Regions:
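C-terminal interaction-tip segments
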Residues: 1-13, 24, 116-141
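N-terminal low-complexity, intrinsically disordered "leader/linker" segments enriched in small/polar
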Residues: 1-56
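Hydrophobic beta-strand residues in large extracellular and virion-surface proteins
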Residues: 4, 42, 68, 79-81, ...
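Hydrophobic beta-strand segments within beta-rich accessory/binding domains
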Residues: 49-55, 64-70, 111-115
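Short, surface-exposed beta-strand/strand-loop-strand elements in extracellular ectodomains
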Residues: 60-65, 69-88
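Intrinsically disordered, low-complexity Pro/Gly/Ser/Thr-rich segments with frequent PxxP/GP/PP motifs
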Residues: 86-107
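Noncatalytic modules at the cell exterior or secretory-pathway interfaces
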Residues: 102-123
Length: 141
């Protein structure tokens, strides 16, 4: 089960308070996802794309959810997240994302790049986890 709560007094003209829960289930079923890579940590030292999770063609049509967080405390050090060479988002220091991952082919790798990284900025810690339904999902990180 994944829960997200958004609360803000100043994002709109009126206060915003949204909370929703989703049960992470297998594709086309009511059975919960039962596999995970566990929480992993890498220290990014590159402004070029690095494979965080490698796509597996057998993963197409199976349910998978991905969690990624930029653990940097410096808001200017952001990560660019791509799938199949398409940018899906940027995570600034402290930002995170949780999204479904459909592996349509082996080019659907999830890659990260430390966009503003230089050797002077030091490592950018990134944590991630894959929740999935099939034991054939493997990561290379």
């Amino acid at each position: 089960t994944a829960t997200i709560t958004l609360t803000s007094a100043d994002i709109a003209g009126d206060p915003v308070n949204v909370s929703t829960t989703a049960t992470c289930t297998k594709a086309g079923a009511t059975t919960d996802l039962d596999q995970t890579t566990g929480l992993n940590r890498v220290h990014l030292r590159s402004a070029t794309n690095k494979v965080l999770l490698a796509a597996n063609a057998e993963g197409d049509n199976l349910a998978a959810k991905v969690y990624i967080i930029n653990k940097s405390t410096d808001p200017s050090l952001y990560l660019t997240i791509t799938i199949n060479a398409q940018t899906i988002g940027k995570l600034y220091g402290g930002d995170w994302m949780f999204f479904p991952w459909s592996q349509t082919d082996t080019s659907a790798n999830i890659e990260v790049a430390a966009t503003n990284w230089t050797s002077a900025t030091g490592d950018i810690p990134v944590e991630y986890a894959l929740f999935h339904e099939d034991t054939d999902f493997l990561t290379n990180a």
